[in-house]
């Protein structure tokens, strides 16, 4: 497996945790009889995940390497999260470019995506292929919410993804404190071991993002880092005002569930949603204005205020995807639109064809196409 150095370091954090979750899920369905298998087995366990790390071969951005004879591969920065890259494959005289998830040019932490190299075929993501980011400033949005909940002595619970979103919110909070937009003494807690370990990688990979040395220090020092379960439980005995960031970002699992169950029934408190909430998740239930959410087999009354930030996505929007394509010095012979909901992918296909006149296709799942 080949990846950027930062991605390799993230895998060392994420994969063992994923294996542990697989084991827990298998154990749960076995205990409750929710399986046709006898017994249900994890797809992989923590030990196997750790062993797989030996297969990783870090490759620097811009370095061309040969994974197998006859193939050349070059990674360029995609600007999405730490270590994210686009992939140029050169084989049999053809140049095939995979965009990967592309970031925003104005991202709070990440540098803009690199301009794409010349390619015969491009596969471009379309997560936001039919959407534009609103012009609201995410720092101002967050500041207004935190100032409001702090003034009434409440607790703000912020569900975050451990990689990327947690660090962006932490850095935004550090800027708000520096400007005096929120109280400098407002206690902040990052309650996610995975997010704590990921935050440390920004110091290890200073060229993989836009933060300077002071920015990295601000990122590391703005919050109390909570790792142990006992430390996490003790937060429930504290009184507001305070802010708790915890995974997961859509409230599908993790420590944030305990905080939501504890703080949702109090009208002084606030839940701040920082990104897209997929249908069927607890985050989507919170965003919908529902009065009840189910957590740990109990119906929890939602009395806390729920705020959803409108401009915090780390994905390039439709116009930014078009700008990335238009920065190519030479038009490709074929573009394939991938990695998006059907409506988003088709909207981006139409826009590419209309704007640039390039041959563009949304391939069906399982179909085969020439490059």
Please give the residue ranges for each predicted region.
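His/Asp/Glu-rich metal-coordinating catalytic cores
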Residues: 1-168, 174-184
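Short, compositionally biased "basic patch" segments
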Residues: 106-121, 196, 202, 277-301
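Short, conserved loop/helix-junction motifs that constitute active-site signature segments
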Residues: 114-118, 182-183, 262-267, 299, ...
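Hard-cation-handling environments
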Residues: 142-281, 294, 354
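A short, acidic, amphipathic alpha-helical segment used as a generic capping/interface helix at domain edges
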Residues: 254-263, 313-329
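Hydrophobic, well-ordered secondary-structure elements that form the walls
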Residues: 256, 335, 360
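Generic long, charged, amphipathic alpha-helical segments
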Residues: 294-325
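C-terminal structured "cap/appendage" subdomains that terminate the fold
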Residues: 321-357
């Amino acid at each position: 497996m080949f990846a950027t150095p930062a991605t390799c370091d993230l895998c060392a954090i994420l994969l063992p945790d994923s294996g542990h979750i697989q084991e827990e899920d298998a154990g749960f369905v076995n205990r409750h009889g929710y399986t046709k298998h006898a017994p249900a087995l994890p797809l992989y366990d923590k030990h196997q995940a750790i062993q797989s790390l030996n297969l990783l071969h870090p490759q620097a951005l811009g370095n061309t390497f040969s994974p197998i004879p006859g193939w050349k591969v070059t990674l360029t920065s995609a600007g999405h999260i730490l270590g994210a890259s686009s992939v140029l494959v050169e084989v049999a005289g053809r140049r095939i470019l995979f965009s990967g998830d592309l970031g925003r040019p104005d991202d709070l932490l990440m540098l803009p995506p690199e301009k794409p190299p010349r390619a015969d075929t491009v596969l471009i993501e379309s997560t936001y292929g039919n959407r534009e980011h609103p012009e609201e400033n995410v720092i101002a949005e967050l500041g207004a919410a935190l100032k409001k909940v702090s003034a009434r002595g409440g607790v703000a619970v912020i569900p975050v993804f451990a990689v990327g979103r947690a660090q962006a919110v932490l850095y935004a909070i550090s800027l708000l404190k520096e400007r005096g937009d929120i109280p400098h003494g407002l206690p902040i807690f990052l309650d996610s071991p995975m997010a704590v370990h990921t935050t440390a990688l920004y110091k290890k990979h200073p060229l993989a993002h836009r933060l300077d040395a002071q920015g990295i220090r601000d990122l590391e020092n703005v919050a109390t880092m909570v790792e142990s379960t006992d430390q996490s439980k003790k937060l429930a005995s504290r009184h507001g005002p305070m802010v708790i960031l915890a995974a997961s970002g859509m409230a599908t699992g993790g420590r944030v569930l305990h905080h939501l169950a504890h703080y949702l029934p109090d009208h002084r408190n606030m839940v701040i949603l920082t990104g897209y909430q997929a249908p069927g998740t607890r985050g989507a239930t919170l965003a919908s204005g529902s009065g009840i959410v189910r957590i740990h087999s109990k119906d929890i009354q939602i009395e806390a205020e729920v705020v959803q930030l409108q401009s915090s996505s780390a994905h390039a929007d439709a116009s930014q995807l078009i700008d990335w394509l238009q920065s190519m010095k030479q038009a490709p012979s074929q573009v394939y639109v991938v990695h998006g909901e059907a409506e988003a992918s088709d909207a981006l296909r139409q826009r590419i064809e209309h704007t640039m006149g390039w041959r563009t296709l949304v391939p069906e799942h399982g179909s085969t196409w020439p490059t």
